């Protein structure tokens, strides 16, 4: 509907949904859940005060919320609740936040719908610390993956 992806776009989130390599290597070890409709994984980019945040994507290439089929949107929403509860139980965080961007004016920079779920801690200043990000190693992500996968069983 309101699409902005460039011609010949190679979608990194489609690659993750299919279990393929991305420009940042394989993300398969970061996947905490996958079914025929959605994939959830520990994000590749972290904010230092909020490690282990999760991204949920539709497996089908859907650029933004405007094109989201209701059935898949409901599955993403339902799973985001499971992630939020898992954060509270396993990360012992003080709260959670979700974030989702559409179109360039909405700060979308990957042309595949994705919902971020962040663990929140009192005084973490998540929305003020955009410069305090980094790309964690697979080893650094592993304890978060294991906690969430175990909780989801």
Where are these regions (language model features)?
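HIT superfamily nucleotide-processing domains
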Residues: 1-153
């Amino acid at each position: 509907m309101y699409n902005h992806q460039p011609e010949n776009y190679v979608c990194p989130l489609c690659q993750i949904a299919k279990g393929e390599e991305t420009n940042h290597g394989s993300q398969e070890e970061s996947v905490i859940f996958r079914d025929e409709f959605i994939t959830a994984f520990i994000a590749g980019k972290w904010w230092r005060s909020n490690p282990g945040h999760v991204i949920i994507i539709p497996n089908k290439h859907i650029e933004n919320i405007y094109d989201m089929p209701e059935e898949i949107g409901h599955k993403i929403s339902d799973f985001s609740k499971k992630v939020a509860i898992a954060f509270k139980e396993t990360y012992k965080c003080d709260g959670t936040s979700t974030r989702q961007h559409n179109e360039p004016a909405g700060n979308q920079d990957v042309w595949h719908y994705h919902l971020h779920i962040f663990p929140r801690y009192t005084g973490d200043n998540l929305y003020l610390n955009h410069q305090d990000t980094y790309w964690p190693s697979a080893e650094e992500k592993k304890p978060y993956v294991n906690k969430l996968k175990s909780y989801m069983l």
